[in-house]
Amino acid sequence: MEVAMSKDLQQEANLAKKRYIDLCRQGRIFDARNRIIGGDTQAWDFQVRDQKIKEITDKARHEAFAAEMKHNDKVMCMAHDREQRHRKQLCRAINDFQQNFQKPETRREFDLSDPLALQKELPARISDNDMRNTISGMQKFMGEDLNFQERRRFQKEQSREWFLQQHGEREKARADHLLAEHLHTQTRLKFDETARELMKLEGSTRKEVCAAVKAFNKNQVVELTERKRQEKQQEQEDNMTEITNLLHGDLLSENPRPVASSFGSHRVVLDRWKGMNREQLEEIWFTQKRQIQEKLRLQEEERQHSMDWDLRRIRKAHASLLHERQQQRLLREQRRALDCSNLNLARQQYLQKKQMNTASSSQPTEDYFSQFNTRSR
């Protein structure tokens, strides 16, 4: 039967503690899910922060585009409603004109399809002056017509009245047509003015969005630079504190003489003594200083590299903003040139149409009326 001594218990506890520390160390190094040793956590944090900033910027841009699309849809709906109302008014005016000035009773061929023609028809002969008395009807013979001159004068007056009436109707129709064209031109000009105002509003909105994005990026760059400076300063202070603690602690300034263990003179306490001489300690100190300098140099290179990338991003954003402004300026110039060309073309067409109307609307003279009914046949 074995008896557990205090030394054996102490040794067993130390071995269990060492095994536990070893298991914890294996978990920190070989666990792929929770391992942070050998990885750049600072770069991971920067990547996560950049991804969040990108998501926020994309969300703001999408919201701005959605608001702009909503505004454009509203303007298109208003323009569509205005055009529908104009079409209804034009159709109503056409219907009123047809009902008031294009009645079936006013047609020249209405007597051929008049349902009351039999009721309106006259007898075979009313008097000697009846115009329907022909030679074949034997109702009136040559020399018996005493109202020949009066009838001829009446025919001329009637033809004159008909012509004047037709001329007045044509003039009125031409005036109505010119008025409709004038209203159409005014409506088109109003639509063009509304489109120009919308383009100006769109340009100002884009300028405000670009200015906000530029200010946001500038603030982010300043904040990132200040944060890196503070982190670097804190890291340097922590490194100096760690170096000072190591230089003045028991780990590096311990007694070079071996500390005998309670289990024998050939044993030493591992957590207190490493068994190194003065030369080995100086070599370790020199290596540590060199590693510190190398780490500081790498950090400085990384900081310089980050500043270069930030400067490149700022320059690229500035160049893209300048390019977008140039494109907007070119679009405005093209739109202005197109408007001027359309206005000149409209003026030329209006002058040409006015000349044609003036040339085709001359007043008839007495010679024009005297050429009708010059003979008996």
From Swiss-Prot:
One Pfam entry name: RIB43A
One GO term (biological process): flagellated sperm motility
Region (Disordered): 354-377
Cellular compartment(s): Cytoplasm, Cytoskeleton, Cilium axoneme; Cytoplasm, Cytoskeleton, Flagellum axoneme
Keywords: Cell projection, Cilium, Coiled coil, Cytoplasm, Cytoskeleton, Flagellum
Endoplasmic reticulum among keywords: no
Predominant place of localization: cytoplasm
One of the record's GO cellular component terms: sperm flagellum
Coiled-coil regions, chain positions: 217-246
Family stated for the protein in its record: Belongs to the RIB43A family.
Record's subunit section: Microtubule inner protein component of sperm flagellar doublet microtubules.
The protein's role, per its UniProt record: Microtubule inner protein (MIP) part of the dynein-decorated doublet microtubules (DMTs) in cilia axoneme, which is required for motile cilia beating.
Protein name: RIB43A-like with coiled-coils protein 2
UniProt lineage: Eukaryota, Metazoa, Chordata, Craniata, Vertebrata
